[in-house]
Amino acid sequence: VKRRVSYPAWLKRSLVVITAGFIGVNIMLPPPMAEAEKSSPVVLDKDGQWLAGFTIDAGTWRIAADLDEIDPRFTQRLIAIEDSRFYTHSGVDLPAIARAAQSWKRAGKAVSGASTITMQLVRQIEPRPRTLPSKMIESARALQYELYYSKDEILEMYLTHTPYGGNVEGIYAATQTYFGKTPEYLTDAEIALLIALPQAPEARRPDRNPDMAEKGRNRILNKLASEGHITAQMQAEAKEVLLGGSRAPIPEMAWITAYGLAADSGPTQTTLDIILQRNAEQIASEFAKKLPGPVNTAITIVDNKTLKVRAHVASADRQRPGGWIDMTDRPRSPGSTLKPFIYGMAMDDGLAAAGSFVHDAPTRFGSYQPENFNRRYHGDVRIFEALRHSLNVPAVTLLDQIGGQRFENSLKSAGVDVTRLGAGGEDAGLAIALGGAGLTVNDVAVLYAALANGGKAAPLTWKPNTKTIATRMMTRASAGEITKILRQAPTPDGRVPAWLVKNAPAISYKTGTSYGFRDAWAAGYTDDWTVVVWVGRPDGAPRPGETGRLAAAPLLFDLISALPHSGTQSHFEKDAAAPKGLQRVSAQETRGPQILFPPEGSEILAEDLGASSRGFSLTAQSETGKVTFYVNGKPVPKDSGRSVWRPEHSGFYNVTAVDGNGLSAKSRVQVLTFDDLANAEL
């Protein structure tokens, strides 16, 4: 029969008191979990790449560690050096304490330490003087931490708080600062240095004391080799690595954007793409160097298929006046960038079609009388011409029929926050067509992405797994017509038209200039991307002569050309299929003339005008060989056997070619002068 062991009553009472006391202290004085888990906010791209980070606690870099993203050889060797029984003790290593006490007794001073990784973590979070009472408190706290956290969580917190010299804490900040990389893949020399540094963080800083850092590193290499963790060859090769040099900068891409998206602590993943972000920032920075000091630019780039923001430049240069302001989020007058949506809504209402005519002449709408940008008028023009050349009066005419408030409501239903810049009332409502209301760069990106998506608008997304609801702004057919018109807009000066460049994406775009030349805009899209550019002064000061076409469109085209494209390269729509029941036939026996110059929809630059000008030689191809030209119904006279047309003024003209069989061909063209180009707003 087993004899029952009986313990003294005083021992039982003591155990109860000690247990109750520990539980009471644990409840009343829990470990500072908030401080233990606090780390620098870090913003990541869509694939987890580091875009930017922010310091905490008087400028400290402390990046949260993740064991899955740290070289496992580092953690194995760290534990071997610092706390070989880490995974078996409960926060306090009693054999290590006994060994340290015996060493101290023999040598008369501390020879080996007894602090576990958990105790070191306690000291990092709650610094205390190096005294015996402090050691006892640290031991108690270590036991607490072991109750609250798993071993891996403790190790991650330790690798988050470990000091590495200066304002650097944690393995992530250390590898970024001293090696310019993450801790996922480390060399033997780097591992040894990272183990040696926390033992004397300031004395062994490689950027300030490379000799001391090398001695500490080599001491760790010797110990690792003696204990069989590395070979003699690995030891020798690691010792050959030189130390020194300046600290690598912490990444700060999309800095202003990241600041707005970052959580209070720890990592925040975004939809940004680090490669596209880097390209956009470089292009914007080079562009900004050519701008006067107070002028800046802002950019939003959106993936049309997902509406995720892939690149975002809140300010091209933070060192300029107002450079710390996110100019993509500030309401500014959008100029003419809303005109495509007026025409699209008019098409939906049956008020207009791409080829229908609208009158362009001085017109008063109540007390509001808009003017064209260059104060010239063209009479009856087709809708596609009015939009392509950004005529003001036709846009306001259609908006008056649609209703200014109704149009504004359609923008708001798409998620766009319309800000009135002037006084309310009917006049302000119609003025929205010409920039009389404030929109942000991000708002304009929502609208143009809707055109790219067949008329469906939805909010932009900045973080993964964000759910949004789409709203139809216009029918797919109307969005397609608008896209076709904007796709045929002339490219910025000095650029080869995209349709002449192999594999160049088909770009639909519109520019805008606010009243007083305060804001220059360019918004464009391809099948894959929507890009919106703003250029101006953050203080809203005017920049005379700086239109959207001159100041913003070149940057838009630079950005789009740097993006990857997988969509259509088609620049002009094919003829629509014949309605059901009809058949396309080709008249092979008798073909009418074909106008070679000027082609349909072309713009012709005239050096001079009138009867004394050089004029333009009109040419056509015809089976009869004989062609007579008419411009606006009047015959064009012959000059040395050629039909030479000498326009009297700039504007739109109808050119007709009639052959010997009486068959004809027509083209509608616009004549421009150098003055027109100087005052152009497209």
Regions found by a protein language model. Name each.
Residues 48, 78, 121, 154, ...:
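Residue-level preference for non-acidic, small/hydrophobic
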Residues 106-130, 184, 246-260, 352-408, ...:
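Conserved catalytic neighborhood of penicillin-recognizing serine enzymes
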Residues 2-293, 304, 308-310, 315, ...:
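Juxtamembrane regions of bacterial inner-membrane/periplasmic proteins
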Residues 1, 23, 230, 238, ...:
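Soluble, non-transmembrane domains of envelope/secretory-pathway proteins that act on or interact
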Residues 270-291, 300-301, 312, 319-328, ...:
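A penicillin-recognizing enzyme superfamily signal
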Residues 38-40, 296-299, 503, 518-520, ...:
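Short loop/turn microsegments at loop-to-beta-strand junctions
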Residues 49-63, 173, 202-206, 258-264, ...:
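Short pre-catalytic segments that frame enzyme active sites
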Residues 82, 86, 105, 125, ...:
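A generic secondary-structure signal for well-formed alpha-helical elements
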